[in-house]
Amino acid sequence: MHLRLLVDEPGAAAWNMAVDEALLTLALQPTLRLYGWQPHAVSLGWFQRASDFADLPPGTEVVRRLTGGGAIHHGDEVTFALAIDADRLPREVSASYRLLHDAAVRSLGELGVLCERLVAGAAQSPRPTDRWCFAQPGRDDVVTALGKLLGSAQRRVQQPRARVLHHGSIVLQRPALTPWVAATADTTAGDEPFRRRLCTLLATQFAAALDLELAPGQLTAPELALAEQLQEQRYRQPDFTRHR
């Protein structure tokens, strides 16, 4: 079995979320997508209230994620989305976080980023107490001495089959709205060569952790069609963003 690898150019918020949902719904093989955000945007966790972010600067692009957790200001970062059948991950949610976060720690370590998976603290929750994801390091998060470096969240569905979408964001440069977060640039680099090397290492380490063979690919025609539909009918719609 292969892990299909999609490495995309930075995209708009609605498009990014639409593609990830299309992969969760239609992907016939495990798929890892690596991408960025242009323009920079704020994503809200599935359970968050949009009204809690009324103080964002005018013109800030906001989108709702399919996954839970706190809001993220997506700036200069590497975002990954893993769409995979549930039986290819540990049944326990926390164990699946550990598997994937350990792979991320190994990837970052090869680039000289001093980080670790937090073994203490509160367990992961889809409904965080702080509105910002990176303000609240919890058990199994990837952290540096300066704070949380990797924010993750999941969505698990049972129909048409048991599937998981795992989102992760690794901060390269501190974003404007959340300048207190940790970033790879704090200790090493956050430039384009670093980004490319990190993407390569993440893909290699995730494939090894999942015991899959890495295979570059692209969106299928049905996935692309569904993503375009979801972008227009869901993720670009203000009512969907504000539905909580």
Label for each model-derived stretch:
Residues 54, 89-93, 178-181, 197:
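Short, conserved charged micro-motifs
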Residues 79-129:
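Contiguous, small/hydrophobic- and glycine-enriched helical/loop subdomains that border
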Residues 126-139:
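Charged, often glycine-rich, active-site loop that binds/positions anionic groups
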Residues 1-57, 64-65, 133, 194-244:
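Active-site loop/lid in soluble adenylation, ligation, and acyl-transfer enzymes
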Residues 136-143, 147-157:
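Aromatic/basic-lined ligand-recognition segments
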Residues 105-126, 153-244:
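Long, positively charged amphipathic alpha-helical accessory segments at protein N-termini or as interdomain linkers
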Residues 49-91:
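A glycine-rich, hydrophobic loop/mini-helix early in the fold
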Residues 75-77, 137, 165:
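Short, solvent-exposed loop/turn segments at the edges of secondary structure
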